[in-house]
Amino acid sequence: MMSRFLIPVAIAGLLTACASTTPTYYTLQASTSTAVAAPVAQAWKGFQLRRMDVPAQLDRRSFVLTQSTGGQVNLLNDSQWASPLPDEMSLALVSGLQDRLGVPQLAGAAAKTPYWQIDVLVQRFESVYGERATLELSWALSPVGFEAKTRQCRWLDSEPAASVPELVQAHRQLQQRWADALAAQMQGKPVPVNLSKAMLCAS
């Protein structure tokens, strides 16, 4: 972990570099080398991500850094997401679920096609320079066209990280762990213990 006395100096250096460097672009999507799961027999044929709501201050492409002391927030224009954060999170979740489930997202589901509908509300997508990345969100998983219980859950997970590239990688890992838990939930499988610790669902 970076010394708290050095963090403001390091951030100042990053902000100074912003004015003179070409932006570096990052994505939340995992490597395409992940093997796609074979679809299994099930009552539903796909899923639809209906909503991905992100706090207004994060609805941007610039990387948002939070200082560990004082709560100061800095925008890094030289470190940007490849698309606005809500789109990055949506693309990462959709591709992650497709890889794990072997079924497509149904953007315009045909009549009588059974699918899972997903609504996500992001409370926190935090990058604390020199310390950690944190993801906090809630979601509703609703069956459409088939019989199943609607799930309403909350997720809070963190991953240690220091530099901007490390924070990006940490956010990718958090996104992948959440996709693992959500995919297990959709398949009616037990969520692994290491993931269930970050998860709280309404009974």
Feature annotation, model-predicted:
Residues 18-82, 190-203:
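A structural "domain/chain start" motif
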Residues 1-18:
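Sec-dependent bacterial lipoprotein signal peptides
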Residues 19-38, 43, 99-146:
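Surface-exposed short loop/turn segments
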